[in-house]
C-alpha cells in the first residue's frame, strides 16, 4: 500500500451513463478506495482552463468519497497544483498509487510527473479507465520503463 491513493478525474463530466466510462469502473475504484484509510485518499478534479471557477465540479454518481482532501487541476497532471505538491511534501509522502481516468490522459500525465518528483509510483489497472486500449500499450511501456509498479488488469 502506498502512502497516498490519488483518485483522478472520477467526475460526472467523464464517468456516467453514455460516457466512455461507467458503473463498472466506479465499482472498481470504490473497491480500491475502501482498502485505504480515509486520511490517505486524495481526490483530483479536473477543471478546464476555460471553465468558470464558481461552477461546482461533481463526482461521478456512486463514487465512494471518504475524504475532504480534494484538489483541482487545470492541466493534465495533478502536480500542476502547488497545493497538492505542498500537501504531499508536508506529510512526508514517499509513495503514491494512482487510479481513475483516463489512462492515456490525466492519469498518464500525473503518473509521469510523480516519477519526476521522485515518488515511488504504482497504478492499479483494474481501477483505471482507458478509452483507447491500443494507444494504452505505449503508455504502459512508458510507465514500466520509468519504474512505475503496474498491477492488475484493465476491466
What are these regions (language model features)?
Residues 4, 117, 140:
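Catalytic phosphate/metal-binding cores of nucleic-acid and nucleotide-processing enzymes, i.e., regions
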Residues 91-95, 99-105:
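Active-site neighborhoods of divalent-metal-dependent phosphate/nucleic-acid chemistry enzymes
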Residues 27-36, 105-116:
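Histidine-anchored nucleotide/phosphate-binding helix
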Residues 71-77, 128-129:
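Short beta->alpha junction loops
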Amino acid at each position: 500500500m502506498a502512502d497516498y491513493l490519488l483518485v483522478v478525474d472520477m467526475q460526472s463530466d467523464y464517468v456516467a451513463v453514455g460516457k466512455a466510462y461507467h458503473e463498472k469502473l466506479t465499482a472498481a475504484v470504490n473497491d480500491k478506495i475502501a482498502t485505504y484509510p480515509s486520511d490517505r485518499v486524495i481526490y483530483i478534479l479536473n477543471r478546464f482552463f476555460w471553465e468558470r471557477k464558481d461552477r461546482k465540479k461533481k463526482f461521478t454518481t456512486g463514487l465512494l468519497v471518504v475524504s475532504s482532501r480534494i484538489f483541482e487541476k487545470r492541466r493534465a497532471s495533478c502536480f500542476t497544483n502547488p497545493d497538492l505538491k505542498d500537501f504531499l511534501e508536508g506529510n512526508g509522502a514517499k509513495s503514491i498509487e494512482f487510479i481513475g481516468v483516463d489512462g492515456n490522459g490525466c492519469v498518464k500525465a500525473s503518473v509521469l510527473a510523480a516519477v519526476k518528483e521522485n515518488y515511488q509510483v504504482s497504478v492499479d489497472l483494474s481501477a483505471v479507465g482507458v478509452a483507447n486500449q491500443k494507444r494504452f500499450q505505449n503508455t504502459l511501456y512508458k510507465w514500466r520503463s520509468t519504474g512505475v509498479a503496474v498491477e492488475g488488469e484493465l476491466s
